[in-house]
Design a protein with these regions (language model features):
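Terminal targeting signals and extreme-terminal segments of soluble enzymes
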Residues: 1-147
Length: 147
């Protein structure tokens, strides 16, 4: 599967999941860059009407995972046995918003055979930085036994 098809694949596979419930849209997903967007809506807010930190962090984690998946699966097509799992995540929440669309852009810091480290910046519709998230993901190999 060509790398430019991963965004459509993720949007399709997200149907019925928490990702779809939130309204996440995978815009670009390659092994070099993943861009996801999320529109503001009241169900994603905390008590004062701004984005809930969990919604921002979930979007960033989805971007990290998508990029790592594109790396792990390569051109071979969708393989659940190669789907990466976040094992560590660090988030710095810098500001917040109560309107518009937020955008997460993930880039790789390290892509190995068994792990990936991905950095994601989340920005508001005015390109103001909302959060910086770094995640370490384990890359299971196809056919590996889980325990």
């Amino acid at each position: 599967m060509p790398t430019n098809d991963w965004a459509a694949e993720f949007n399709q596979r997200a149907a019925g999941s928490m990702i779809a419930d939130h309204g996440t849209n995978f815009r670009t997903v390659t092994a070099e860059r993943a861009v996801l967007e999320l529109d503001f809506k009241p169900s994603l807010t905390q008590l004062t009407g701004i984005f809930h930190a969990g919604a921002i962090i979930a979007l960033a984690d989805e971007a990290c995972t998508a990029l790592a998946a594109a790396h792990a699966m390569g051109e071979g097509g969708w393989d659940p046995a190669k789907f990466p799992l976040t094992v560590q995540l660090s988030a710095n929440l810098i500001r917040n918003t109560n309107r518009g669309t937020i955008r997460a852009e993930a880039t790789p810091l390290h892509r190995g055979r068994t792990t990936a480290v991905v950095r994601t910046e989340v920005r508001d519709q005015d390109a103001k930085l909302l959060a910086v998230v770094t995640a370490t993901l384990v890359l299971p190999s196809a056919g590996a036994k889980s325990g």
